[in-house]
Amino acid sequence: MKNKSEDFWKKKLTGEQYKVLREKATETPFSGELLNNKEKGVYKCMACGSPLFTSDKKYDSGTGWPSFWNAIDDESVELSEDNSLGMTRVEVKCANCGSHLGHLFDDGPEKMTDGRNGTGKRFCINSCALNFTKK
């Protein structure tokens, strides 16, 4: 799906989704409908439908965006250096279609409140970049 034209994506996505997924914008914090979602299921790429994250790896980071301590697997996302905004960050993209999802930070939980081990990672993902499928 990485070879799809921008015209294809403009027709498929809403205006906000296009800005975030294709132009690397960031949605307003605390505005996304999936931020407080507590249901069990899978979070998929809004653009192509590829599974990216699961509810059992989601946690409340207090940042205003859905946060996950790991992806569904190592092949579902691509990581790359992002030097925009005068700082170096790690961009998270869908491995299947190349759409921008958010950023990866090293300030995630080492230990979860329920006793599970975390990864120390925080995948900070735009809510509008995700489509949730309930289990």
List the predicted regions and their residue ranges.
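A short Gly-Trp-Pro
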Residues: 2-135
